[in-house]
Regions:
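N-terminal assembly/attachment segments of tailed bacteriophage virion structural proteins
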Residues: 1-123
Length: 124
């Protein structure tokens, strides 16, 4: 399994990263996405995570282990060639406040973006 590790900031620094995949390949690469805040790794264990890719119109649920976001590249992510800007969306549902116990609040934060490119697959 090939692992690609990225550090993605919540403060959205200007520097950009790039991940290149091949059309039709899936299950053989894992993205390890460390979410940082103020330059320090943030424990995201209490969040739900999804990789969102604008341009490719893809949203993929991710796993979280030891406070780090992991995604084994699924078939849907490499179904077609193209480029997009990707980011991790973290969401956390919390119960209502003391004033309104019936409400449910969802807090959402996003990381900086990175370029995700899916190259054309090799044709037989």
């Amino acid at each position: 399994m090939i692992e690609v590790a990225l550090r993605l900031g919540l403060d959205k620094p200007a520097e950009s990263r790039r991940v290149v995949l091949r059309q039709g390949e899936f299950g053989n690469m894992r993205l390890r996405l460390v979410v940082c805040e103020g330059g320090m790794a943030k424990d995201v264990s209490l969040y739900d995570a999804a990789l969102c890719v604008a341009g490719l119109c893809v949203e993929v649920p991710c796993n979280i282990a030891d406070g780090v976001v992991f995604l084994t590249v699924p078939k849907g992510l490499t179904a077609k060639a193209g480029k997009g800007r990707a980011y991790v969306r973290l969401s956390q549902v919390s119960d209502g406040t003391a004033d309104d116990a019936d409400t449910v609040q969802t807090d959402v934060i996003t990381t900086q973006t990175f370029e995700l490119e899916v190259l054309e697959g090799v044709q037989p």
